[in-house]
Amino acid sequence: MTTGDCCHLPGSLCDCTDSATFLKSLEESDLGRPQYVTQVTAKDGQLLSTVIKALGTQSDGPICRICHEGGNGERLLSPCDCTGTLGTVHKTCLEKWLSSSNTSYCELCHTEFAVERRPRPVTEWLKDPGPRHEKRTLFCDMVCFLFITPLAAISGWLCLRGAQDHLQFNSRLEAVGLIALTIALFTIYVLWTLVSFRYHCQLYSEWRRTNQKVLLLIPDSKTATTIHHSFLSSKLLKFASDETTV
């Protein structure tokens, strides 16, 4: 997962104004003030969030390094060894980050998180707007299975019935041919069913492995301590920047 930052000044152009929604949000904003824009994307290129803020309205306290919001709506955590403005994060933002990147460690300080991964049900896989060819293949195979299964059963029954009739009239060659045809028919049907079932099971297993629900496990005592240190670090950084400006 990556974050891209840019500063929008009046009359300036940059590469983050590609989508129509993004342009609309910029047009509706106050163009007389510079804006701070952050886009958070996963490794597969999927846009997770876009944050647009005026530079003059940034919070003085600690903010989430993913969504760049303060701790008013949700408590900020410091689950890793990162300090300063990169040391605090929302629990839900970090869980979404870890789920999208399919990792369990901080990509900056490489601290391992204590997480619990829960697999998602099959219904979410069917509703997932992923690759459409996989869903089309699944739909076609289900239709073929519903059509071929009764057809194979009826054909096998007719072949066995014909072989029985030929045996009664001492036509052993025709009876053996019908029995061989029945065996070949059911062999092809079983092989096709097993191959199709295995293919879709592999697709579901891969999706289930990379789309798990991540729950971050952090003790309350550690949360309180790390939040205090992160807040002090942000205050020191702000104080140092004020002295530099003066």
From Swiss-Prot:
E3 ubiquitin-protein ligase which may be involved in endosomal trafficking. E3 ubiquitin ligases accept ubiquitin from an E2 ubiquitin-conjugating enzyme in the form of a thioester and then directly transfer the ubiquitin to targeted substrates. This is E3 ubiquitin-protein ligase MARCHF2. The chain crosses the membrane at residues 138-158, 175-195. It catalyses: S-ubiquitinyl-[E2 ubiquitin-conjugating enzyme]-L-cysteine + [acceptor protein]-L-lysine = [E2 ubiquitin-conjugating enzyme]-L-cysteine + N(6)-ubiquitinyl-[acceptor protein]-L-lysine. Zn(2+) 2 binds at residues 80, 82, 106, 109. Keywords: Endocytosis, Endoplasmic reticulum, Endosome, Lysosome, Membrane, Metal-binding, Transferase, Transmembrane, Transmembrane helix, Ubl conjugation pathway, Zinc, Zinc-finger. One of its GO terms (biological process) is endocytosis. Pathway: Protein modification; protein ubiquitination. The keyword NADP does not apply. It is an enzyme of class 2 (transferase). It comes from the Eukaryota. InterPro entries: Znf_RING-CH, Znf_RING/FYVE/PHD. Zn(2+) 1 binds at residues 64, 67, 90, 93.
